[in-house]
């Protein structure tokens, strides 16, 4: 994909991997639409892109709200006339044993982490299919293959996103579409996601093993847009978890 006057939408762009991905595309001269719930974090991400000479549009958006997602998409279309890449990265998580989880908390994780990807993908397809081009990138996790204790809601969502993405890819292939769909299976990331998580324990929940810088996700997303792989397994710990699950 050529990088001339391109537009990317990044959800979950206020912090962590989403912000790193947005900054990566901004440094390359892309127009970047930033979607997240927190206006202050969005403003900081926008300023970071503009400081490197990039162009950014900050749109406070709850990805669990389909009307808000479509409204954000429409604002991008009005501002820039098209969307070349849509990166789904927004997430919520819940830490605790299954028997203690409240249905409303579990539902919120599903609405943001799964349905947010569904709504984002649909919003992107509505503008990409008429022009028969574009790329959708789903930020996944090794937990899309290997579920772990105490994060049942998040793991269920990542498994579901993988199934949803595979179905979408098959539909586009059947159409002969030029739209690519890639899923990046990430390792544990050094982000503030567990500071945001609803945690039923008194102590902080932290990934075991190596934690990767969010810039690793940014480079993987950049590669996915230009190479259109079905999946990328990113980082040794993610590869070991996925392959180990397949073998044992």
Which sequence ranges carry the predicted segments?
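SDR active-site lid
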Residues: 173-248
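Conserved glycine-rich Rossmann-like NAD(P)H-binding loop of the short-chain dehydrogenase/reductase
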Residues: 28-44
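Residue(s) in the substrate-gating loop at a strand-loop-helix junction
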Residues: 141
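The beta1-alpha1 cofactor-binding region of Rossmann-like NAD(H)/NADP(H)-dependent oxidoreductases
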Residues: 39, 60-71, 103
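Conserved glycine-rich cofactor-binding loop
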Residues: 12-16
């Amino acid at each position: 994909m050529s990088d001339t006057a391109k537009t990317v939408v990044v959800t979950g762009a206020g912090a962590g991997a989403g912000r790193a991905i947005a900054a990566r595309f901004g440094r390359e001269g892309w127009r970047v639409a930033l979607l997240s719930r927190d206006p202050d974090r969005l403003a900081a991400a926008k300023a970071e892109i503009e400081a490197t000479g990039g162009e950014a549009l900050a749109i406070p958006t709850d990805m669990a709200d389909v009307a808000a997602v479509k409204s954000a998409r429409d604002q991008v279309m009005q501002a820039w006339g098209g969307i070349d890449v849509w990166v789904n990265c927004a997430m919520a998580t819940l830490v605790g044993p299954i028997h203690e989880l409240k249905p409303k908390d579990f539902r919120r994780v599903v609405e943001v982490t799964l349905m947010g990807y569904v709504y984002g993908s649909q919003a992107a397809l509505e503008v990409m299919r008429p022009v028969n081009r574009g790329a959708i990138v789903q930020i996944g996790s090794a937990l899309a293959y290997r579920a772990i204790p105490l994060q049942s809601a998040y793991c269920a969502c990542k498994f579901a996103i993988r199934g949803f993405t595979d179905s979408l890819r098959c539909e586009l292939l059947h159409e002969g579409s030029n739209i690519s769909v890639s899923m990046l299976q990430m390792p544990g990331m050094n982000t503030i996601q567990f500071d945001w998580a609803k945690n039923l324990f008194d102590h902080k929940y932290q990934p075991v093993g190596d934690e990767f810088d969010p810039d690793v996700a940014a480079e993987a997303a950049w590669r996915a847009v230009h190479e259109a792989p079905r999946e990328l397994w990113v980082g040794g710990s993610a590869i070991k978890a996925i392959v180990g699950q397949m073998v044992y």
